[in-house]
Amino acid sequence: VVRRAIVTPDKHFPIHDKKAIKIVCKAIEIVKPDIYIDLGDTGEWEHFSSHYWKGRSAKPMEDLIPLLNKDVKDVNKGMDMIDESLDKVNCKERHFVQGNHEVWLDKFVIRYPYLEQYKTENALKIEKRGYEYHPYNRKKLLKIGKLNFTHGKFVSKYHSFKHLDVYGESIMYGHTHDLQRHTKTHAGGTISAWSLG
C-alpha cells in the first residue's frame, strides 16, 4: 500500500519564511497526504536558548515569563497554520520529532521543574493536536516502512554520508539547513540519507 507523506524540517517559527510556509500549506491541500511528519526545530525558541542569555544578566522570573509565553504563542500560531491545512484534507497520522531547539524547553523545565507547561509536549499541545511524539535523536527512531526519520545529528561537510554510515538504514532528517543526499548500494539493497534542509 502506497501512502503519501509530507515532511517538514526546521521552520523556526516566528522567524520562518512566510512564503515557504504558505507553499507548504498549499502543498498539503493539493497532495492530501496520509501522513505528516514535523522533523523538529519548529520554533526558534529564542528566549529558552542559552545562546540568547550568554553574556546577559539573568532576568527575574516575572520578566522572563512574558518572553517565554510569547515564544510559545508564536510557535503555536505557526503550527496552527499547518494543522489547519492538515485538518482540511483529513490527515490523521501526524508525527512530531523533537529538534535540538525544542530540547532547550525541556532543559529549562529541568532547571525550573515547577514550570512544567514549558515542556515541549505541553507547550506545543502535541497530544491535543493529534501528533505522536518522538523525543530528540533517540536510538529508536520514527520508522515508516523502510524509512527512518530524525531531526538530525551531524553537521559535517558530508553529513548525509555520516547519517547513513551511523544509522545503516535509509533516513530522512533536517537540522543542517541545507540539502544533501548520499546513497549506498550493498548486497542487501540500496539505502539513502536525505537532508531536507
Model-derived regions, located:
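Mobile, glycine- and charge-enriched loop segments
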Residues: 1-18
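Alpha-helical hydrophobic/aromatic positions enriched in membrane-embedded helices and signal peptides
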Residues: 2, 33, 91, 143, ...
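Active-site metal-binding loops of divalent metal-dependent hydrolases
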Residues: 9-12, 40-44, 100-102, 152-154, ...
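Core catalytic region of metal-dependent phosphoesterases/phosphodiesterases
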Residues: 13-127
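A structural signal for short, well-ordered beta-strand segments and their strand-loop junctions
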Residues: 35-39, 90-98, 135, 149-151, ...
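Active-site-proximal segments of metal-dependent phosphoesterases and phosphodiesterases across multiple
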Residues: 61-66, 108-168
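Conserved beta-sheet core of the metallophosphoesterase superfamily
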Residues: 146-197
